[in-house]
A protein has these predicted regions:
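N-terminal intrinsically disordered, low-complexity segments enriched in P/E/S/T
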Residues: 24-185
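Bacterial N-terminal signal peptides
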Residues: 9-20
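Bacterial N-terminal signal peptides that target proteins for export
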Residues: 1-11
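N-terminal twin-arginine translocation
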Residues: 2-3, 19-24
Length: 185
């Protein structure tokens, strides 16, 4: 390694070591898991995508998103956020911080969660295109959401039930690949 590149590389390595496990994707290295935390950041439970599919009732939303065309709807399936949060025993908190795999953070008010019932979508309905591309086989009705489609977990809200003022002002509530739900006062 050349001497003029050694110092910047060492400085970066030291900065990452000092920042610790909360810096970058290393803090939550698996986008296929969701960690539920109390307000101090202590993990209460870790759920896999498979557990989100099998341990909670599934809700289906046929909805658009802030990024789809006005006439384009996608059918998503997954558990209600309020059902997942109730499992923590912290359902009475005022807010929930959602941390995404890319370190994006969104703050949700509990009244929003109760009023609009977002889901943590883990699947989307198979389409003709999915079948022709081999992403769905036989009578398969739903398939996993890919990273390119904002998965493997995507916080989906019933777009048509949201107040008009939420778009675009609250687009941050549609969290791509959330990995942590943290209680917040």
């Amino acid at each position: 390694m050349r001497r003029d590149t050694l110092a910047p590389c060492l400085a970066f390595a030291v900065a990452m070591a000092v920042a610790g496990p909360t810096a970058g994707k290393g803090a939550f290295a698996d986008p296929d898991t969701l960690t539920l935390e109390d307000a101090s950041g202590k993990a209460i439970q870790i759920l896999t995508v498979e557990q989100l599919k099998t341990e909670f009732p599934q809700q289906t939303y046929d909805t658009r998103t802030p990024w789809t065309k006005e006439d384009e709807k996608i059918v998503y399936r997954g558990p209600l956020l309020k059902d997942i949060w109730a499992k923590t025993g912290l359902a009475n908190v005022a807010k929930v911080k959602v941390v995404a795999y890319d370190d994006f953070v969104s703050e949700l008010r509990m009244d929003e969660i109760q009023s609009y019932a977002p889901i943590l979508a883990v699947e989307r309905q198979c389409t003709k295109d999915d079948r022709s591309q081999g992403r769905c086989k036989g009578d398969q009705q739903f398939r996993p959401i890919t990273m390119n489609e904002k998965g493997p977990i995507f916080m989906v809200w019933p777009f048509d039930r949201l107040p008009a003022s939420y778009v675009p002002a609250r687009n941050a509530i549609w969290v791509f690949f959330p990995v942590v739900l943290r209680a917040d006062q």
